[in-house]
């Protein structure tokens, strides 16, 4: 609410909230799930007025994801993985407390910065919660986003196998060079608790 409230004047914000409670049929009685309902409400086009920021829905979704990670009861596993395993030869294991998002630079939006037109290229954001329980974000590029997606979608593949798929998709001829780049990225992800290591069934 804090960011959305800061980019809309008080009357417009109150009118939007009032329309949400008056017109939207919430499907949940749980307070922590109200932000998800608000995103659904905005996505339907209800309550929107001419002059509203074009990124309002994306901002609401981003703040909802922050809340989801902050309130999640998921925990980092204590066993069942190699914290220092080889991220290319073995099977990388992702933290359950991360999400890859793409849209406006909503993490930078404030009263002074409100982009009015879409970016020429998609902006990718990685939002995650570390072992210290703090939710953070980082901007990533499209190949990094795809690398994480491939690991998530192919839990039985080694890092090398995932990189091979990425190289084919990108039409990148030098797989070894891409593997070297990817290893640096994966090591950074492990340092940030986005990767917790490698599975025990691998090296």
What is each residue range found by the language model?
Residues 91-153:
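Low-complexity, glycine/alanine/valine/leucine- and proline-rich hydrophobic stretches
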Residues 1-83, 133, 138-203:
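Long, charge-rich, low-complexity alpha-helical segments
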Residues 74-101:
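Short, conserved active-site entrance elements at the starts or edges of catalytic domains
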């Amino acid at each position: 609410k804090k960011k959305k409230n800061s980019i809309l004047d008080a009357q417009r914000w109150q009118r939007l909230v009032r329309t949400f409670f008056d017109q939207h049929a919430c499907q949940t009685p749980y307070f922590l799930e109200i932000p998800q309902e608000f995103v659904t409400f905005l996505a339907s086009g209800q309550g929107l007025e001419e002059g509203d920021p074009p990124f309002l829905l994306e901002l609401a979704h981003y703040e909802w994801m922050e809340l989801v990670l902050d309130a999640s009861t998921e925990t980092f596993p204590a066993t069942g993985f190699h914290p220092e395993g080889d991220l290319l030869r073995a099977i990388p294991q992702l933290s359950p407390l991360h999400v890859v998002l793409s849209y406006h630079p909503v993490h930078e939006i404030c009263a002074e910065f409100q982009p009015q037109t879409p970016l020429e290229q998609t902006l990718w954001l990685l939002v995650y919660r570390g072992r210290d329980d703090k939710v953070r974000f980082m901007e990533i590029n499209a190949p990094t986003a795809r690398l994480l997606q491939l690991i998530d979608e192919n839990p039985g593949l080694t890092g090398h196998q995932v990189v091979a798929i990425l190289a084919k998709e990108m039409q990148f001829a030098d797989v070894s060079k891409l593997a070297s780049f990817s290893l640096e990225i994966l090591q950074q992800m492990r340092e940030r608790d986005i990767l917790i290591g490698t599975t025990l069934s691998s090296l």
